[in-house]
Regions:
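FIC/Doc superfamily catalytic core
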Residues: 1-280
C-alpha cells in the first residue's frame, strides 16, 4: 500500500503541473463536472454518454439527445447542481445539514418519479422511512443505520482535520461505511461518490472518477467490505482508478502535443517543397 500511495502522490504533482494547473480554473471545473456526472450516473444505469452530457450542460433541456429520457436528463442536471453546491462549500465541515442539502439537490427532479409507488412518499433531502436493499444486498434496520450517520460524518471530519491519514484512504473508508448505511430512499451511490470527492477536493486532490465500464469491479470492491470485513480492496480500487485516470490524461496531452508539432513540421516541409518547385 505504501508503494501505491507514493506512486499516487508523485503522479498527483505531475498531473497538477502538466494538466490541471495549465487550464483555467473554470474550464477544468467544467471538464471534471461533465466527466464525473456522466460516469457516476452511468454506474446507476443512465445511458447518457460523456458527449451527450456535455451537450446537456451547454444547452440544457432544449437539446435532449434522441433515445434519451427526460428522467435521465434530470438525473444528470441534478448531479450538476449537487456537485456545484459542494464546490462552493469546500470550507464547510462534513455535517448532516451539508449531506441532506446535497441529497436534496441531487434528487430534486427525480425522487418523486422513482418512488411514486411507495406507500409513504419520499422527499429529497430526507432520510428513508423504510429498510433498504440494492442489487443482492439487504441493508440493516434503517432507523439504527441512520443514527450512525452523524457519527460517521463527525469522525471523518476529525480524521480530515488531523492530517494523519492520506485523503484517498479517508475518502474510500467514508464511502464504504456510507454505502452500507444507505440512509436515503434513492441516490445513495451518487451521493456517496459526491461526498468522497468533496473529501478529496477539500485536501486539493484530483477528482476520483470511476468509469461506468468499471462498475462491476467497483461493486465487487464494495461487497468485499461485508464479505471479508475489510475495506482494503476499496482503498486499493480508489488509488488505482485515480492513478489510471491521471496517467491516461497526461499521456493523452503529451500525444496530442507531439502530433500537433509533427503536423506543423509536415506543413512547413510541404510549403518549403512548393517554394522550391516554384523557383524552378
Amino acid at each position: 500500500e505504501d508503494k501505491l500511495i507514493s506512486r499516487y502522490d508523485i503522479l498527483v504533482n505531475r498531473y497538477k503541473e502538466l494538466v490541471s494547473e495549465k487550464l483555467s480554473r473554470k474550464d477544468f471545473i467544467e471538464y471534471n463536472e461533465i466527466l464525473f456526472s456522466a460516469h457516476s450516473c452511468a454506474i446507476e444505469g443512465n445511458s447518457f454518454s460523456v458527449d451527450e452530457t456535455r451537450t446537456l450542460k451547454e444547452k440544457g433541456l432544449g437539446m435532449i439527445p434522441k433515445g434519451k429520457t427526460l428522467l435521465e436528463a434530470f438525473e444528470i442536471l441534478d448531479h450538476f447542481q449537487a456537485y456545484e453546491y459542494l464546490l462552493k462549500n469546500l470550507d464547510r465541515p462534513l455535517t448532516e445539514e451539508l449531506l441532506k442539502e446535497t441529497h436534496r439537490l441531487l434528487t430534486e427532479h427525480t425522487l418523486s418519479y422513482k418512488t411514486q409507488y411507495d406507500e409513504i412518499p419520499s422527499n429529497p433531502g430526507e432520510y428513508t422511512t423504510v429498510d433498504m436493499c440494492a442489487g443482492d444486498t439487504i441493508f440493516g434496520d434503517h432507523e439504527q443505520l441512520i443514527k450512525q450517520v452523524p457519527r460517521l460524518l463527525q469522525s471523518t471530519q476529525q480524521v480530515l482535520d488531523s492530517g494523519k491519514i492520506h485523503p484517498m484512504i479517508i475518502a474510500a473508508r467514508f464511502h464504504g461505511f456510507y454505502e452500507y448505511l444507505h440512509p436515503f430512499r434513492d441516490g445513495n451511490g451518487r451521493l456517496g461518490r459526491l461526498m468522497s470527492n468533496f473529501i478529496l477536493l477539500k485536501k486539493e486532490q484530483p477528482l476520483l472518477i470511476i468509469p461506468g465500464s468499471q462498475r462491476e469491479e467497483y461493486i465487487t470492491a464494495l461487497k468485499y467490505i461485508k464479505k471479508e470485513r475489510t475495506d482494503e480492496f476499496l482503498i486499493d480500487f480508489f488509488f488505482r482508478t485515480s492513478i489510471k485516470r491521471m496517467e491516461q490524461e497526461i499521456e493523452e496531452k503529451k500525444n496530442l502535443t507531439e502530433n500537433f508539432i509533427r503536423g506543423m513540421e509536415f506543413v512547413r516541409n510541404v510549403k518549403s517543397s512548393n517554394d522550391d518547385i516554384s523557383e524552378i
